[in-house]
Design a protein with these regions (language model features):
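Periplasmic N-terminal accessory/gating domains of Gram-negative outer-membrane beta-barrel systems
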Residues: 2-107, 117-125, 140
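Outer-membrane beta-barrel domain signature, especially the mid-to-C-terminal portions
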Residues: 30-31, 179-182
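Short, surface-exposed acidic
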Residues: 52-56, 158, 182
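Predominantly transmembrane beta-strands of Gram-negative outer membrane beta-barrel pores used
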Residues: 70, 98-107, 115-123, 130-180
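Alpha-helix N-cap/helix-start motif
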Residues: 80-81, 110-111, 154
Length: 182
């Protein structure tokens, strides 16, 4: 009389990120916008994400403060992700490929954060021809130009330059409003 015992090894899921959301450029640009599309404004419409006012793009995620979030651009920390006094994010939506947002339960490699993790991933430049675009809105102007790099040893590459300029300082100067002056 022989007893045969068989078992299977239980699989361990290394990635169990329940609150991860991936946004692409189409989703960011189709969201309702305050003057122009903004990734932080898009994220503020998600469950668990709040803001203090219509004039703040700061992300309050699940009761945490904005300084408890980790904001990254292509995996590198961005320490001041706000533009125009916090009304907009510094990220130009014309160059965003996608954004990965973790509203909790994120991996330990992002340790020391209690709020959220946002990794904005830039898109590649145009590798076939030189193109550009410009946009003028009520409070800012932005431009983008991109094109291919010369082929070198069979490799293709591209370049991209993007910039945004607000009119805040010119409006303040025109209205003669003293800011920080005695």
């Amino acid at each position: 009389s022989e007893v045969l015992v068989t078992a299977e090894r239980q699989k361990f899921e290394r990635s169990m990120e329940s609150s991860q959301i991936a946004l692409d450029l189409r989703e960011i640009n189709s969201a309702p916008a305050f003057v122009e599309p903004d990734i932080f404004r898009t994220l503020q419409m998600l469950p668990g994400v709040q803001t203090t006012s219509d004039f703040s793009s700061a992300l309050y995620v699940r009761g945490s403060t904005p300084d408890q979030n980790l904001i990254m651009l292509d995996g590198i920390a961005v320490y001041n992700p706000y533009h125009l006094g916090g009304i907009f994010s510094t990220f130009n939506t014309d160059v965003i490929k996608e954004a990965d947002f973790h509203a909790g339960g994120f991996p330990a490699r992002y340790g020391g954060r209690m709020g959220a993790i946002l990794n904005v991933i830039n898109r590649e430049g145009n590798t076939t021809k030189t193109t550009g675009m410009a946009n003028i809105s009520l409070i800012s102007s932005k431009a983008l130009i991109e094109g291919p790099l010369p082929k070198w040893r069979g490799m293709k590459g591209s370049w991209m330059i993007s910039g945004r300029r607000t009119y805040f300082d010119t409006v303040i100067d025109a209205l003669k409003i003293p800011l920080g002056q005695n």
